Amino acid sequence: MTDTASRPTVEPLVEEFRIYIFSKLRAPIEFKNLITAEVDSTRIMVFDMSSPIIHHLRIGVHSCRLINSKQQTVGLIQSSDLDLPSFDLEPLNFRSLSGNQFEQFDVKFLNDPSFKNFYRLRGNDCNGVRDLFDSQLRKHLMELDGIYVEGKGDLLLYCFPDTMMEPSELQTFFSVGFNLMSLLARQDVQRECVANDIRELLSKARQA
């Protein structure tokens, strides 16, 4: 299902996430091309988020203004199967707001030093986030080098910064989010339930 009036649906859910706050500091944000799928206790929304970037140039006594757009496809999952501590995971080449502005702290894994070569992980509850990011999840994330992820309560947000997905890539993009959700479910029983939800959601997304 596509909803061109995306802002009222999406913005209240994402307005506390860092990537939204960081983008909105520069310019108003536009949401478009919303696709949703829902089954039981799980809902996923995939949408494009864009904001204009203004460059002021001066050549001699003349000045001009160039405007281009920063765009990316974002996935947002809301599920009662998730109960996440607040965290954000960003690739090393991504520059967002300082974690100190959100009272967040760096989360490190002394037994897995290679992880820091791929990502920067922050959270309010370091021990809770560290327990959540077990070796299986860290390995999966390193194979997805470049993904950006935020979690909070029953919400999970993910994207590949500055990357717009083509229509032919959306099915894979859905799957990336569902796989992350499955790995972030805290117990094996939850993971099995989530896996069933994923299969149903993928089926509905194909039909939409």
Regions found by a protein language model. Give the residues of each.
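Charged, low-complexity intrinsically disordered regions
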Residues: D3, R7-A208
